[in-house]
Regions:
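Bacterial N-terminal signal peptides that target proteins for export
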Residues: 1-12
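N-terminal signal peptide c-region/cleavage motif recognized by signal peptidases
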Residues: 21-23
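N-terminal (or domain-start) structured segment
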Residues: 26-114, 151-153, 159, 175-202, ...
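An extracytoplasmic/periplasmic, membrane-proximal ligand-sensing/linker region
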Residues: 30-32, 172, 260-322
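Extracytoplasmic/secreted proteins, especially bacterial periplasmic and envelope-associated proteins
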Residues: 47, 51, 55, 76, ...
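Hinge/capping helix and adjacent helix->loop/strand transition within the periplasmic-binding protein
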Residues: 83-89, 103-188, 236, 249-282
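C-terminal lobe and pocket-closing loops
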Residues: 124, 207-275, 304-307, 321
Length: 322
């Protein structure tokens, strides 16, 4: 009888501990969150990541620690994310390279569709043909004519970056030769375009003042229709290169197998960020538009982007390893 009594007491104590631990389980997030940025500090990507991170930190009362891991068009950063726990405490900002890396690299150390959890598309940005102001070309026709006299150099943030893709696609569709000059970041390529070390880029200006101040010359925009931000800048299509359209974008992902509760919470709070005046003003000042969608919609968007560029590459002569 005595043993039965003590066994009963032990059972009740253990049951109480289990119930207490269940009811007092901390709600996500209860510790700092790590936000990986696959590019060097500075530039559009960094500004977007830090704006999102600052808002999430204030909303959740937990630090969001930024960690820049540049290299290999986002592959190095992606490896870090893939090896992290699927608990929502490690997230990553992604750009176009995330979608098209499977087209560039024969073997990746991860599966883009299976090893990540898409959270939401953050923003999309118009791209322009930006040239050094001393380049003797004020429109696409003059640029094409100049390229037939000498090959033009175009810069990018690295092989497979949005600037590389847009530049390679433009030269191929325009039927002219260009020399790709990859940099460790898009902002470095932009500064070298300003200084005249390279001729041009196809990119969104990391600072609109570069164009308004005359440090860069915008001769065409890579959208279907003219942009209200650059009303006097013709599209590349109307300038004589049919069907040319290009843009850059940024999104947020986590490792695979995020729980629905954590995923939905991150998505919901990130959408609050995107609807804030602070974020809208930042994106607008950089020549872009805020986005925001569901995890399922962003997953489809990533696959559609890869399919879009896959078709474009098959129809043009592009070597992305150059």
């Amino acid at each position: 009888m005595k043993n039965f009594f003590f066994c009963s007491i032990r059972f009740l104590v253990m049951a109480s501990i289990i119930c207490l631990s269940t009811t007092t389980k901390a709600e996500y997030p209860d510790k700092p969150i790590r936000l990986i940025i696959p590019f060097f500090p500075g530039g559009t990507t960094d500004q977007i990541a830090r704006t999102v991170g600052t808002h999430l930190s204030r909303a959740w009362g937990q630090p969001v620690v930024m960690e820049n891991k540049p290299g290999a068009n986002g592959v190095i950063a992606s490896e870090t994310l893939v090896s992290s726990r699927s608990d929502g405490y490690t997230l990553m900002l992604v750009a176009m390279g995330h979608a098209i890396n499977p087209l560039i690299y024969q073997k990746l150390p991860y599966d883009t569709d299976r090893d990540f959890t898409p959270i939401t598309l953050l923003a999309k940005f118009n791209q322009l043909i930006l040239v050094n102001p001393n380049l003797p070309a004020s429109n696409v026709k003059e640029l094409i004519a100049l390229s037939k006299i000498r090959p033009l150099t175009y810069g990018s943030g690295g092989n497979g970056s949005s600037q590389h893709l847009a530049g390679a696609l433009f030269f191929s569709m325009a039927g002219i030769q260009g020399i790709h000059v990859p940099y460790k970041g898009g902002s470095q390529a932009m500064l070298d375009t300003i200084s005249g070390n390279i001729d041009m880029m196809v990119a969104q200006p990391s600072s609109p003042t570069y164009v308004s101040s005359g440090q860069l010359k915008a001769i065409a925009i890579a959208t279907k229709h003219r942009s209200p931000d650059y009303p006097n800048t013709p599209t590349i299509i109307e300038s004589g290169v049919p069907k040319f359209e290009s843009y850059s974008w940024y999104g947020l992902v986590g490792p695979k197998n995020l729980s629905p509760q954590v995923l939905n919470k991150i998505n919901a709070e990130t959408l609050v960020v995107l609807n804030s005046e602070n974020f809208k003003n930042l994106v607008s000042s950089l020549g872009g538009e805020t986005a925001g969608n569901t995890p399922a919609e962003f997953s489809k968007f990533i696959k559609d982007e890869r399919r879009r560029y896959s078709v474009a590459f098959k129809n043009t002569e592009i070597n992305l390893n150059q």
